Amino acid sequence: MARVYVGNLDPRVTARELEDEFRVFGVLRSVWVARKPPGFAFIDFDDRRDAQDAIRDIDGKNGWRVELSRNASSGRGGRDRYGSSESKCYECGETGHFARECRLRIGSGGLGSGRRRSRSRSRSRSPRYRRSPSYGRRSYSPAGRSPRRRSVSPARARSYSRSPQYNRGRDESPAYDNGYRRSRS
């Protein structure tokens, strides 16, 4: 079986019209025309050679773009349990297995036994990261201490402001009394 993609279709083209156009090249299994969004279709041929003949003759005709569909190597769209026919292992670059199953990774001690892995993981965890009882998330705090809380009075907090406050005049400032600077005593 071979699936052919037909693009740049007029939205008014019907499956029957496409079937009539492509049937002359060979036996069709199915014709599917997209409606939302319109403008493309898929046609399944029984024989790959018939599909290639149709592509050669119809591509460009009526402004259509006709090509072999990318995932048509098998009845399941060319996919297997590894995602797709082109999936490769991240470790060695070979197809047919995942990185966690790669013999290079396992052989070099990358995975090792599950027992050794879990022990080293628990040893490497920093004591500063503690499980928070709420939501099960980690929170950062120095070991042995809870986060420091500051209680700052509103007047004092105002004096630490980085940006100048323009709404306060000289006479209203707590450091000035009758327009003259008070000395701290």
From Swiss-Prot:
InterPro entries: Nucleotide-bd_a/b_plait_sf (IPR012677), RBD_domain_sf (IPR035979), RRM_dom (IPR000504), SRSF (IPR050907), Znf_CCHC (IPR001878), Znf_CCHC_sf (IPR036875). Expressed in roots, leaves and immature seeds. The keyword Ribosomal protein does not apply. Residues 2-73 form the RRM domain. Keywords: Metal-binding, mRNA processing, mRNA splicing, Nucleus, Zinc, Zinc-finger. GO terms for biological process: mRNA cis splicing, via spliceosome. It comes from the Eukaryota. Residues 132-145, 152-163 have a biased composition (Low complexity). One of its GO terms (cellular component) is nuclear speck. A zinc finger (CCHC-type) spans 87-104. It is found in: Nucleus. Extensively phosphorylated on serine residues in the RS domain. Residues 114-131 have a biased composition (Basic residues). Residues 109-185 are annotated as: Disordered. Disulfide bonds: none annotated. It holds the Pfam family zf-CCHC. GO terms for molecular function: RNA binding; zinc ion binding. Its main location: nucleus. Involved in pre-mRNA splicing. PANTHER family: SERINE/ARGININE RICH SPLICING FACTOR. Belongs to the splicing factor SR family. This is Serine/arginine-rich splicing factor RSZ21A. It comes from Oryza sativa subsp. japonica (Rice).
